[in-house]
Regions:
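N-terminal beta-alpha lobe that positions the nucleotide/phosphoryl donor
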Residues: 1-123
Length: 123
């Protein structure tokens, strides 16, 4: 079991993951943009890390900042929630390269989902 999980998301999904972590005795680490500093998920988490300015591309979609936050807080795993990086195979590979577990499908599964989506759109 993990000791700590970094939640790479915001809002209600992050709150639900934080509460699940608490119920399981796992420490939660919230990431947040400067715009979200007063959000509920930030308040509820055991630890919190600012990952940049407001636009998602500069914060919640910035893979390097999220990996850095996970490493700096000794997170055992990253939970992406949904959206943002949850279906990004490159992010899954980056987690693996940095010794951080990714809670979600493998990069290969995500790659195959993308290929199936491309097949359907080309029909």
């Amino acid at each position: 079991m993990f000791r700590s999980i970094l939640i790479a998301n915001r809002g209600e999904i992050a709150v639900r993951i934080i509460r699940a972590c608490r119920n399981m005795g796992i420490k939660s680490i919230a990431v947040y943009s400067k715009e979200d500093k007063d959000s509920l998920h930030v308040q509820l988490a055991d630890r919190r890390v600012c990952i940049g300015e407001g636009p998602a591309k500069n914060s919640y979609l910035n893979m390097e900042r999220i990996i850095s936050a996970a490493k700096n807080t000794d997170a055992d795993a990253i939970h992406p929630g949904f959206g943002f990086l949850s279906e990004n195979a490159d992010f899954v590979r980056l987690c693996k390269e940095n010794g951080i577990a990714f809670i979600g499908p493998s990069a290969e599964v995500i790659d195959s989902m993308g290929n199936r989506s491309e097949e359907h759109t080309s029909e």
